[in-house]
A protein has these predicted regions:
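Rossmann-like NAD(P)H-binding beta-loop-alpha module
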Residues: 12, 23-87
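Short coil/turn connectors at secondary-structure junctions
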Residues: 13-16, 38-41, 240, 284
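C-terminal catalytic/substrate-binding lobe primarily of soluble NAD(P)-dependent oxidoreductases
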Residues: 64-323
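Aromatic/hydrophobic pocket-lining residues that form π-stacking "cages" and hydrophobic walls in ligand
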Residues: 4-7, 32, 98
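Short, ordered loop/turn segments at secondary-structure junctions
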Residues: 1, 23-25, 48-49, 249, ...
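Short secondary-structure boundary/hinge segments and terminal tails
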Residues: 3-5, 28-29, 54, 120-121, ...
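Rossmann-fold NAD(P)-binding glycine/threonine-rich loop
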Residues: 1-17, 21-24
């Protein structure tokens, strides 16, 4: 998220392709969105599932085992990178992946990021629709990640923890009738329906991206604008002088945030919250700003990020139209 939209623009200008990796969830979600729009449906929400409880935002590489041991059969802890896996658990990975989807599809984040509502795969259309229609979303046209765990800690049956989904709206009585007749997992009103993929295979399907780029000059999902960012958010009360340890560490997690808010408030992108020292205290749950850390303005990653902020200083500057 630090510079993806800028890199995609550079690749296109050079005649190349900048692509999400097929097989990982963001590219699969982009395919869901493309399918829905090409078929003439309005995309209400798109996203994935994960294992989530609110206290996971405070998890760290030392105590993440308490979570991992509940659902993974780990025979040798040395085979696991706890910092990496902690980023999967603490909400960071979900924020990164849903931001990638927003920047590639034209969907937008909710104003307070992801809410992780528990949902079975059969409840997607009931849960992932606007609150005004009885769902959990603040509006249509957003991303959301559903949880495979209820807030009381019990597992959700028929969850989508490894899968992806899209929720669509039927604009006609005929479409809504088809949702029911063809078992498109409609909500109780019949107005909304869902399509899901139960699994993703990560790198095992990457060859599809390579073939698509090489043979058709077509990415399997790529940024078209800067709509969503991932900002460093304090896992606990942080003290001035502490050294931040980045994604999956002890200090911060990555929260999906509308890009215009990130730019307006000068929020610190998660990708640059590593090996930088805090200049002031930050309360637990607080979003860090550039001014809160002692960063090197000459660092190459910082320079590229600042270049992207200048290029996309207004929402969707340079964005291609999303059909």
């Amino acid at each position: 998220m630090d510079a993806g939209p800028l890199l995609a623009r550079r690749a296109k200008a050079a005649g190349g392709d900048y692509s999400l990796a097929w097989g990982d969830q963001p590219a699969l979600i982009c395919e869901h969105v493309d399918w829905a729009r090409a078929a003439g449906f309005t995309v209400v929400c798109a996203g994935k599932g994960t294992r989530y409880e609110p206290h996971y935002h405070q998890s760290n590489p030392d105590n993440v085992w308490d979570i991992l041991d509940k659902y993974l059969n780990i025979s040798d802890r040395k085979s696991i990178n706890p910092k990496m896996f902690n980023s999967f658990v603490d909400g960071t990975k979900s924020g990164i992946e849903m931001s990638a989807v927003c920047n590639a599809t034209g969907l937008v984040p909710q104003s307070d990021g992801l809410h992780f509502p528990p949902a079975t795969r059969f409840e997607l259309a009931d849960i992932c629709k606007p609150k005004s229609e009885g769902g959990t979303l603040e509006k249509a046209g957003v991303t959301e990640v559903t949880s495979s765990v209820y807030r009381d800690g019990k597992d959700v049956p028929h969850h989508l923890a490894l899968g992806t989904y899209v929720v669509i709206e039927g604009d006609t009585d005929y479409a809504r009738r088809c949702f029911k007749e063809y078992a498109m997992l409609p909500d109780k009103s019949g107005k909304y329906a869902a399509l899901y993929r139960p699994i993703h295979m990560i790198g095992l399907e990457l060859g599809i991206s390579v073939a698509s780029a090489a043979l058709r000059n077509e990415p399997t999902g790529a940024p078209t604008g800067f709509r969503s960012d991932v900002v460093a958010t304090a896992k606990r009360a942080l003290k001035a002088g502490e050294m931040l340890d980045g994604e999956g560490g002890f200090c911060v997690w990555g929260k999906q945030t509308p890009a215009e808010v990130s730019l307006r408030d000068e929020l610190l992108p998660l990708g640059l919250a590593h090996n930088v020292k805090l200049k002031r205290d930050i309360a637990q749950g607080g979003a860090l700003k550039w001014s809160d850390v002692a960063y090197d303005p000459h660092d190459s990653a910082v320079k590229v990020r600042r270049e992207m902020e200048a290029a996309f200083g207004r929402r969707n500057v340079g964005a291609e139209p999303v059909l």
